[in-house]
Amino acid sequence: MAPTPDRDGQDKKVCLGVVTGAHGVRGLVRVKPYTEMPEGVAAYGPVETKDGATSFAISLKGMAKDLVICKLEGVDDRDVAAALRGTELYVPRERLPRASGDEEGWYYADLIGLRAVGLDGRDYGRIAGVENFGAGDLLEIAPAEGGQTVLMGFTDENVPEVDIAGGRVVIDPPAGTFGDDAEAERGE
């Protein structure tokens, strides 16, 4: 399958995790995985930085709580490993298997840039990200009229339809999510 161009015309990449710091003195790194199974961080071949400027062969070395300990090729001492803190690790979308659990087979990364449309057709804006700060998945929506992004729970009730082919996510936001009373019609 050919990669799908993103908004900037670049091939789509999926972030598998982020380096949280060094582990030991031999250049190992701690990685917070964004994959379903933590070891998935090292399962899809070499990883690269978001801009694609640096690529690393990656191997799994162990686990530490909710983090994965990895070896990145070319990172051989603690100082270099520590300097990578905050670096997100990506792979091209086409390296990943078809997403399971949904007949369309999509990943959260596929939602970025899609229109967020209400049940009534109202244009709420575009999906800017999918976040999880520990209490569940959240859609980050950049409002159509501009301003700060809005976070909304990514639940079946709030997001009744994801239409990748149509370039949209149908949302039913809770009252007050977008700072107006239009959502109050939901009857809650």
Curated annotation (Swiss-Prot):
The keyword Cytoplasm applies. The PRC barrel domain binds ribosomal protein uS19. An accessory protein needed during the final step in the assembly of 30S ribosomal subunit, possibly for assembly of the head region. Essential for efficient processing of 16S rRNA. May be needed both before and after RbfA during the maturation of 16S rRNA. It has affinity for free ribosomal 30S subunits but not for 70S ribosomes. InterPro entries: PRC_barrel-like_sf, PRC_RimM, RimM, RimM_N, RimM_N_sf, Transl_B-barrel_sf. One of its GO terms (cellular component) is ribosome. Residues 103-177 form the PRC barrel domain. Gene3D superfamilies: PRC-barrel domain, RimM. PANTHER family: RIBOSOME MATURATION FACTOR RIMM. The gene is rimM. Signal peptide: none annotated. One of its GO terms (biological process) is ribosomal small subunit biogenesis. Binds ribosomal protein uS19. It is found in: Cytoplasm. GO terms for molecular function: ribosome binding. SUPFAM superfamilies: PRC-barrel domain, Translation proteins. Keywords: Chaperone, Cytoplasm, Ribosome biogenesis, rRNA processing. Its main location: cytoplasm. This is Ribosome maturation factor RimM. Belongs to the RimM family. It comes from Parvibaculum lavamentivorans (strain DS-1 / DSM 13023 / NCIMB 13966).
